[in-house]
């Protein structure tokens, strides 16, 4: 297939937005793959803030970062992404160039612990104010479970109402695939 699948396309967008030395956010740490990816993009002089409410996610991600010698450029936060204002250094406000949220539940974890539209929207609103112009927020929306469908609907309603003078919003999905495949919403600050 020549078209980029969902996760490679998300990474491509982040690679365009993030430069060495930049500040980034992983809003849903999960198994740490995005945190490690962002730490690679930001390099030794950059920084990644990564959030999750599950202790397992913190431990898994910390081990991956240590194995890659990237742990010193990351702040792992054991709290919800809706609390990011409390953790992101004020000196980084206006300097965040990329962020990603993989919404749903932790793969291999407790499927009853899922992201919620209200906390995700709160995080997006906070993050948008901290973003640099042309910074990109990526939402990877997994909606094949009831809570995911509810979150999808609320997020699509929210992003469709963002003023075009403030943001460009892209939806990237495969419309002829069955079983509710994930899709991307990308928000670029103008």
What are these model-predicted stretches?
Residues 149-190:
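Class I S-adenosyl-L-methionine
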Residues 119-133:
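A short glycine-rich, Lys/Arg-flanked "PGG" loop and its adjoining helix->strand segment in the class I
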Residues 47-52:
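Conserved SAM-binding motif I beta-strand of class I
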Residues 19, 42-43, 131-133:
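Helix-to-beta-strand junctions that scaffold the AdoMet/dcAdoMet cofactor pocket
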Residues 1-23, 27, 33-36, 40, 58-95:
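S-adenosyl-L-methionine
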Residues 101-122:
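Mobile active-site "lid"/loop adjacent to the S-adenosyl-L-methionine
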Residues 28, 130-141:
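Conserved beta-strand signature within the Rossmann-like core of class I S-adenosyl-L-methionine
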């Amino acid at each position: 297939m020549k078209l980029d699948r969902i996760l490679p396309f998300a990474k491509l967008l982040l690679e365009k937005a993030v430069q060495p030395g930049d500040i980034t956010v992983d809003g849903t740490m999960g198994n740490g793959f995005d945190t490690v990816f962002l730490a690679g993009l930001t390099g030794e002089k950059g920084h990644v803030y990564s959030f999750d409410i599950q202790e397992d996610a913190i431990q898994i991600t910390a081990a991956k970062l240590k194995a890659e010698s990237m742990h010193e450029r990351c702040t792992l936060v054991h709290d919800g992404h809706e609390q990011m204002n409390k953790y992101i250094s004020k000196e980084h406000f206006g300097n965040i160039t990329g962020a990603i949220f993989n919404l749903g539940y932790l793969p291999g974890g407790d499927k009853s612990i899922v992201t919620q539209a209200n906390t995700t929207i709160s995080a997006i609103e906070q993050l948008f104010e901290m973003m640099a112009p042309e910074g990109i927020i990526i939402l990877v929306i997994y909606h094949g479970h009831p809570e995911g469908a509810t979150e999808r609907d609320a997020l699509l309603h929210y992003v469709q109402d963002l003023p075009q003078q403030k943001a460009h919003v892209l939806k990237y999905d495969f419309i002829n695939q069955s079983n509710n495949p994930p899709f991307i919403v990308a928000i670029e600050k103008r």
